[in-house]
Amino acid sequence: MAIWQGRSLRKPSGGRIILARKKRKRELGREPAFTKVAEGREKKKIIRTYGGNRKVRLIEALYANVFDGGKGKKVKVLRVVENPANRQYVRRNIITKGAIIETEIGRAIVTSRPGQHGVVNAVLIKEENA
């Protein structure tokens, strides 16, 4: 069934709201991208959005742009270490904004939205040994 992002047809009391119009195509939503860590090569998908614009969805990520003190590096993503959005995403290697990923140069926190922006940007985390 389609994902509809319009107003609910129910009132807080549970009563029905009768719409004075039909549902519109612009109110349709889409399934989330669920960007995963790639094993072979990166996979992107171009989606037509409202107004004929385009949005790039990153389906599988192989590299991340990791920034450390203003200097950026393109490094390979190894795995997802932690994800505050959903703990099951760690097991499934799904990258979202705020996820902590393991890269070739260390751990980094994702600052971009891969399913919306089509790229993984991250900031290196300073590891403090106690």
Curated annotation (Swiss-Prot):
Keywords, comma-separated and alphabetical: Ribonucleoprotein, Ribosomal protein
Nucleus recorded as keyword: no
Gene3D superfamilies: 2.40.10.310
Biological processes annotated in GO: translation
Entry GO CC: ribonucleoprotein complex; ribosome
Gene Ontology MF: a single term: structural constituent of ribosome
TM annotation in the entry: none
PROSITE patterns: RIBOSOMAL_S8E
The keyword Ribonucleoprotein appears for this protein: yes
The protein's assembly and partners: Part of the 30S ribosomal subunit.
NCBIfam families linked to this entry: eS8
Family that this chain belongs to: Belongs to the eukaryotic ribosomal protein eS8 family.
Protein name: Small ribosomal subunit protein eS8
